[in-house]
């Protein structure tokens, strides 16, 4: 009979074959769900599904992609976000240029 704290389905059962030939049950905590995009909610590629204790053992580059908002946004949402921000900056610069040209003519 397992110990009382092991009698829960929140722990996963791992069947381990011992050198003596018998099978024992080890109880481990389950893996977390995948990291998800903050905008669209899709699972993120390049972010491992590990518990925080196991994530601590990985180097920084193995924890998330090395791009802007890596580990927070998916590549598609990041592309849309960058296009939107750059286009708004360009439009603001054009508007400022039009105002300066109009002020110079009058």
UniProtKB/Swiss-Prot annotation:
One GO term under biological process is: translation
- Coiled coil regions in record: none
Provide GO CC annotations from the record.
Answer: ribonucleoprotein complex; ribosome
The organism is Hyperthermus butylicus (strain DSM 5456 / JCM 9403 / PLM1-5)
What keyword terms does UniProt attach to this protein?
Ribonucleoprotein, Ribosomal protein
- Descriptive protein name: Large ribosomal subunit protein eL34
Gene behind the chain: rpl34e
**Taxonomy, superkingdom:** Archaea
Q: Name one GO molecular function term.
A: structural constituent of ribosome
A Pfam family that this protein carries is Ribosomal_L34e
């Amino acid at each position: 009979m397992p110990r009382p704290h092991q009698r829960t389905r929140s722990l996963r059962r791992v069947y381990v074959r011992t050198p003596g030939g018998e099978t024992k049950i080890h109880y481990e905590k389950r893996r977390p769900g995948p990291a998800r995009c903050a905008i669209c909610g899709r699972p993120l590629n390049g972010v491992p599904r590990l518990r925080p204790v196991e994530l601590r053992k990985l180097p920084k580059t193995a924890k998330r992609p090395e791009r802007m908002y890596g580990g927070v946004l998916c590549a598609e949402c990041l592309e849309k976000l960058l296009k939107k921000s750059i286009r708004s900056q360009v439009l603001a610069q054009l508007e400022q240029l039009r105002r300066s040209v109009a002020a110079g003519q009058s």
